[in-house]
Amino acid sequence: MMAAVGAPEVISQLESAAKVLMAPPSMVSTEQRQHAEHIFLSFRKSKSPFAVCKHILETSKVDYVLFQAATAIMEAVVREWILLEKNSIESLRTFLLTYVLQRPNLQKYVREQILLAVAVIVKRGSLDKSINCKSIFLEVSQLISSGNPTVQTLACSILTALLSEFSSSNKTSNIGLSMEFHGSCKRIFQEDDLRQIFMLTMEVLQEFSRRENLNAQMSCVFQRYLALANQVLSWNFLPPNLGRHYIAMFEATPNVMLKPTESWRESLLDHRVMDLFFTVHRKIREDSDMAQDSLQCLAQLASMQGPIFPDESAQVTYLAHLVEGLLNMINGIEIEDSEAVGISNIISNLISTFSRSVLTALPNVLFASFINCLTLLTCSFGRSAALEEVLDKDDMVYMEAYDKLLESWLTLVQEDEHFPRGCFVQPAVQVFNSYIQCHLAAPDGTRNLTANGVASHEEEEINELQEDDRELFSDQLASIGMLGRIAADHCIPLLTGLLEDRVTRLHGQLQRHQQHLMAAADPDTVDRKVLDDLYEDIHWLILVSGYLLADVPQGETPLIPSEVMEYSIKHSTEVDINTTLQLLGSPGEKATSIPGCNRTDSVIRLLSAVLRTSEVESRATRASLTQLLSPQMGKDIVWFLRRWAKTYLLVDEKLYGQISMPLSTAFGADTEGAQWIVGYLLEKVINNLSVWSSEPELANDTVELLVTLVEKRERANIVVQCENWWSLAKQFASRSPPLHMLSSTVQRTLMKALVLGGFAHMDSDTKQQYWAEVLHPLQQRFLNLINQENFAQICQEVAVKQEIVATLEALCGIAEATQIDNVASLFSFLMDFLSSCIGLMEVYRNSPETVNLIIEVFVEVAHKQICYLGETKSMKLYEVCLTLLQVYSKNNLGRKRLDVAAEEDQYQDLLLIMELLTNLLSKEFIDFSDTDEVLRGQEQSSGAGRAVSAADVVLYGVNIVLPLMSQDLLKFPSLCNQYYKLITFICEIFPEKIPQLPEELFKSLMCSLELGMTSMSSEISQLCLEALSPLAEQCAKTQEKDTPLFIATRHFLKLVFDMLVLQKHNTEMTVAAGEALYTLVCLHQAEYSELVETLLSNQRDALIYQRLADAFNNLTASSTPPTMDRKQKVAFLKSLEEFVANVGGLLCVK
């Protein structure tokens, strides 16, 4: 098109098209816009547009047209590179640079695009060495030394364009070259040219740092070069050997550590570089934008690691200089708000990057100064963070900085054995004291005080909006708890004293308020300010105590922290055990009123202070002062007691090398102390559930404490000996108030606890009586209700529905209580209910919440029990699940969900159905039933007459689910994940069933797999790839050609081939895709050869053709001809790694 007309006509056409594209949508039609876009596209594709583009750049006044001309040059240069003379390319580059130099008022986006074209020319030239960056750097160097700020800014733009173009695939221009090409360029660039840019930048910063006064324009130039230095120091260096992580290395990772190659030693290990950045920061620190860049540069220097250091002594020298510079910078300045995060990043990087041996090799005085500085900074940032909270600031810079420093402390003290003994004790004391002070009210603390010491009264509104402190500040509390252990000698007595004091004051306050109320005063006239301050103090003291005394690791038996154990052992000779037990057993007494209270174990005394808090709360409820209490304090108490009980109650001496006598005597197995405290905790639970039933979070924390008391058999054995346990069970079973008012989730957990308790050690009569009182009433009431003749008429009444929902929740709770040794009895009990539940599906078909809850009962039973069930019982469960699915299917047949809310409902029930099917399938993976004596004795195998298999149920379920899965529903991530997990499982476990599916269902399944592979997240794509191998193996087994599955796998061969060879994909998927490709190649060898031939025949570049041909030959050399053999498959996957590394980027273009 463009060749047929002259330059003026081209310009006229382009300017008209630009006018259309720039016009508001209402002014032009879609067709006009598409036509305009087409004009620009064909212009950019035109052959050798260089002369026209030059003419456009020199004559057109339309910015968008100039931008497009620059883009056309950039694309054409790469496209026609081998046809162009070296001189032509050089003159084109010179023209573009001169053009920009001569037009300082160009629009920024036009200038950036022209410079990008220059960068692309340089990049393309760097590969065949026809152009190198040296001449560019010479020109840039001259521009910099011109002293003209505009010209210097342009020089910076040129360097930035080069840096962006070479840095990573994310920022690389889309110029139709292979990823391998981009990678090679980056590696060449980072060895020499990147360093050259860094040196030029250093010269500018050096020059500017010497100047006394900078005007606005000069400051602007300075800022640009500082940002450029930051870009260089944040460069993600490609390692020399790529291996299979080749492509992944292209993807920019957040928080890139500085890992330069050896060639950078001279540049970066020179102390003057680091000194310059410290000097620069001192100069510009009051400008918040520039300060962020200079601190980020220093943070990157603090993260430096890798081959740049010849040995450890070089690291020590470097680190020592860095620490000295940092201390000099911080000492003697008042830190600005904008510096806090940057400084904390430097410290955080330094502590996480350098090994302990390097840190400890620092001169003693320097290391001590650093730890001292870190201590002061942490305390200072903590105070400022507290102030930010009072003022409710949006930008919590000090909180972010404080979190970082506390994280750094955690890193240090967790490895404190590498450091001089006791070197962290004093710093830990200071940081701990500071934290406590910031969280206590005046006069002891500074909580809610503004900078000038005035109290803020907006606390309540702020707190209402926040999530729970123990979640919100869990990382901070973990660090403070750890520091508290390091300095246990100071911190445990401190917490104890403060908590005892607050509880005594709280007790006094509540007594005064009681007298005030008895004088018939209106409760609203009570001034709560003092009370609220006390509650908030107690809240933080209990949280810190909980984190100091115990960890709660996931899935492990929590142990008493070694520092706490050692502290208790160290002081055990000064402890009177009897007085300690008296203190523990007297929560109603003030600790100081007990003679010899100072000769008690401090760890137990801290627990006693919490029990005392709990006792004051309980007494206040008995005195009808509940309205004066804080539910938050109630939550804190049971949270603490649960955390404590998991670790200390019935402490197992076998798990410890040495044990503290006071702890063992007070809480060990078969001790009076343990029995007393179990009784006390149970009493607390019962009291809470009756007083606080309307506070769902507090009630939930309370029943979780109850579960902790019975989940371990040893603890449960003590619990069931308590009379009030039995009365709690009876009360709940009879749905007596106030327990029936608890929220459904709390009722579910309470049921779980009561069932777990039933498996404690009891004689058979007692056990029978227990079940008769806990489970029998539930069954009776349910059957009486649903067997009423008029149930269909009354089923929607509120009271009836509540009863049904409560029963379903209880059934979920019973299922959740399943353990290997109780599954036999629980399964029989639950099975009686499941058939009745299916009847309820019919009754409540128009009530989605109830239907979901019914399905959830099945989900829980399958999830918790299927892995323990033998064959006969599994069959029963499959049959009842199949019936459930049939009823669900009948009720949903042809049902259209029109509104969004309905789709949400459908989303929930579909999710539950798929969860149920996945749980049933899990039997194939996890099956403990063979080793289960409980079940084996009761079952006879009925292999020959199997009525229903898991496959039947699951495939029937998929038949229901597939037609209901719309594209819109797949946008819900949880639904999408569950769906693909399910269909992958099916293909892996029952591949032989797939060819037997009805035609429509088979097609839907194949379409789903293709959609998942090509249009979903990498996680879903991987699941679908994993589904292909078993399907291909199934085809190979049957050796039937032209079946629908055989044809489908042939289609998948092309998809997987393209994914591995032609598309950019996540390296983690290479293995899954490779396994799929191998099995598909075994099945369709001729088609695979055809794909390779077609690909090779399209290669015009002889070099690429040869490399590809060799790579494909090597790929299959180890397995010719390929067969479904594990050894061959492993060899193929190994070859595939090399194949992807060598040609993975060759055909994948950008």
UniProtKB/Swiss-Prot annotation:
It holds the Pfam family CRM1_C. SUPFAM superfamilies: ARM repeat. It is found in: Cytoplasm; Nucleus. Gene3D superfamilies: Leucine-rich Repeat Variant (1.25.10.10). Keywords: Cytoplasm, Nucleus, Protein transport, Transport. One of its GO terms (biological process) is protein export from nucleus. InterPro entries: ARM-like, ARM-type_fold, XPO1_C_dom, XPO4/7-like. GO terms for molecular function: nuclear export signal receptor activity. The keyword DNA damage does not apply. It comes from the Eukaryota. The keyword Ion transport does not apply. Its main location: cytoplasm. GO terms for cellular component: cytoplasm; nuclear pore. Mediates the nuclear export of proteins (cargos) with broad substrate specificity. Belongs to the exportin family. This is Exportin-4. It comes from Danio rerio. The lineage of its organism: Eukaryota, Metazoa, Chordata, Craniata, Vertebrata. The gene is xpo4.
